[in-house]
Amino acid sequence: MSNLSCFSIIGTHRSVFKFKGDLLVKENYTRFERARIVGARALQIAMGAPVLVEDDGRLDPLGVAIEELKAGVIPITVKRKKS
């Protein structure tokens, strides 16, 4: 298990910067969205999906998914209902 705690991703990283075309866009996720994104991506990595960040082999799939979220390279989008 990596030394990253659940709180380190759920509690502190509220904004993620992603490229949309040539623009750098700031995405704000709720803690529930972040948990779902990281969990889904960790499952994909555990099932053999390619890793999108530099991995030195020390991190487990959850740690890799957290690093991908911090880097803003996770290929998962969030669709919200319009209020």
Curated annotation (Swiss-Prot):
Single GO term (MF): DNA-directed RNA polymerase activity
Pfam family, one: RNA_pol_Rpb6
Major subcellular location class: cytoplasm
Coiled-coil annotated residue ranges, if any: none
Domain of life: Archaea
Role, per record: DNA-dependent RNA polymerase (RNAP) catalyzes the transcription of DNA into RNA using the four ribonucleoside triphosphates as substrates.
Protein name as annotated: DNA-directed RNA polymerase subunit Rpo6
Lineage of the species this protein comes from: Archaea, Methanobacteriati, Methanobacteriota, Stenosarchaea group, Methanomicrobia
